[in-house]
Amino acid sequence: MRALLIIAGLALFLVVCNASQVNEQRKLNEMLSVMFAVEEPQERDDCLGMFSSCNPDNDKCCEGRKCDRRDQWCKWNPW
């Protein structure tokens, strides 16, 4: 009877430890996702995102991007 109680206690201990570890891993994954989330700034539906092919004479790149005349794709424009 004592051996069965010890085995049940160990099994319960392992389940609690595993649940705690899974919860901790989930919190870490959420934190990393928030830290490394890259959101494309796109206010208009018709604007072109980063690295999209564009026409320099009719620049439809999203805010913060500019159509490059030489490469003809939307590049980041800090100014």
Curated annotation (Swiss-Prot):
Expressed by the venom gland. One of its GO terms (molecular function) is toxin activity. One of its GO terms (cellular component) is extracellular region. It is found in: Secreted. The keyword Signal applies. Keywords: Disulfide bond, Ion channel impairing toxin, Knottin, Secreted, Signal, Toxin. Pfam families: Toxin_12. Residues 20-44 form a propeptide. The keyword Iron-sulfur does not apply. Residues 1-19 form the signal peptide. Its main location: secreted. Disulfide bonds join 47-62, 54-67, 61-74. The presence of a 'disulfide through disulfide knot' structurally defines this protein as a knottin. Probable ion channel inhibitor. Belongs to the neurotoxin 10 (Hwtx-1) family. 34 (Jztx-26) subfamily. This is U16-theraphotoxin-Cg1a.
